[in-house]
């Protein structure tokens, strides 16, 4: 078995490795609330477009 066949061959069904950002495909800092699945950096950029507003 070559390294390419073994690398990432284990199925990722749950845990941090199974989810990624819709925008940038990052695995870190995901906002999963309301089924957004966007990392916090992309959320700050796209929040107004999605419909979130800061009231402060």
From Swiss-Prot:
The keyword Plastid is assigned to this record: no
Obligatory cofactor(s): Zn(2+)
Free-text cofactor note: Binds 1 zinc ion per subunit.
PROSITE patterns hit by this protein: RIBOSOMAL_S14 (PS00527)
Molecular-function annotations in GO: structural constituent of ribosome; zinc ion binding
Primary subcellular site in the record, as a coarse category: cytoplasm
Keywords assigned by UniProt, alphabetized: Cytoplasm, Metal-binding, Phosphoprotein, Ribonucleoprotein, Ribosomal protein, Zinc
Residues with the Phosphoserine modification: 25
Cellular component terms per the entry's GO annotation: cytosol; cytosolic small ribosomal subunit
InterPro entries referenced in this protein's UniProt entry, alphabetically: Ribosomal_uS14, Ribosomal_uS14_CS, RIbosomal_uS14_euk_arc, Ribosomal_uS14_sf
Annotated residues for binding of Zn(2+): 21, 24, 39, 42
Cellular compartments annotated: Cytoplasm
More about this protein: Present with 5410 molecules/cell in log phase SD medium.
Family recorded in the similarity comment: Belongs to the universal ribosomal protein uS14 family.
Subunit structure and binding partners: Component of the small ribosomal subunit (SSU). Mature yeast ribosomes consist of a small (40S) and a large (60S) subunit. The 40S small subunit contains 1 molecule of ribosomal RNA (18S rRNA) and 33 different proteins (encoded by 57 genes). The large 60S subunit contains 3 rRNA molecules (25S, 5.8S and 5S rRNA) and 46 different proteins (encoded by 81 genes).
Biological function: Component of the ribosome, a large ribonucleoprotein complex responsible for the synthesis of proteins in the cell. The small ribosomal subunit (SSU) binds messenger RNAs (mRNAs) and translates the encoded message by selecting cognate aminoacyl-transfer RNA (tRNA) molecules. The large subunit (LSU) contains the ribosomal catalytic site termed the peptidyl transferase center (PTC), which catalyzes the formation of peptide bonds, thereby polymerizing the amino acids delivered by tRNAs into a polypeptide chain.
Official protein name in the record: Small ribosomal subunit protein uS14B
